[in-house]
Amino acid sequence: MVRAWRQGDAVAVASPDVSKHDRLAVIGAVEDAAPLVRDVLREVGPSYRPFGDEELVRGLAERVPGLRFSASFGWMDTSDVPDLTTTAAWLDGDAGVEALLAEASPKSYAWPGHPGVRRWAALTGERGELLSIAADAWSAPEVGFLAGVATHPVARGKGLSRQVCGFVTAELVKRHRRVALMVDGDNPAAIAVYRRLGYTYRRVAAAGMR
């Protein structure tokens, strides 16, 4: 169950089992957010990981007892439908997805059967084999979410990831009006692909209880 709290200028929203973890999304001034996060974590438990703009999360880690900064990464989003032609399409199921992820992206947060992972899109080869995939996962009514991007090693360097991500982006923008994704800040190649699809980059971070 999603729950929300507010204190002064700060808002915290607890969402269980989102993108591999229990998440506590936080916005607002750190002076209000720190006592709010402290109280909320006492209520919901230490499994929830505060998430928000990097500067805010670093401030929370300095002010909330027992909370430590975990990692920074990128949040990218767009409300534009990409202008590209692609043969990518939604799969009828998830056959072959797990095997491709295991080979091409074993650290993916999105996997078939995981809570919130709704459907997979793919570009396929001549024999129907999966070449590049991406998922609609953890989407909310007003923001779709793209995850689980992977391309088979033999098919890399051909622009397939851009095509399948462009397809999913277009589908989610039409359905939710906005789409977002998370990306490692030290992955410039992926960031460049998403920028070409119209995404803008924002530095975010997560923290966790010791």
Regions found by a protein language model. Give the residues of each.
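Acyl-donor-binding surface of acyltransferase catalytic domains
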Residues: 9-86
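A conserved beta-turn-beta hairpin within the catalytic core of GNAT-like acetyltransferases
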Residues: 19-25, 138-146, 156
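Conserved acetyl-CoA-binding loop-helix of GNAT-fold acetyltransferases
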Residues: 32-41, 151-153, 157-173, 191-196
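Conserved catalytic-core motifs of GNAT/GCN5-like acyltransferases
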Residues: 68-79, 180, 200-210
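Short amphipathic alpha-helix that is part of the acyltransferase structural core
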Residues: 72-108
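A conserved beta-strand-loop-helix scaffold within acyl/acetyltransferase catalytic domains
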Residues: 109-150
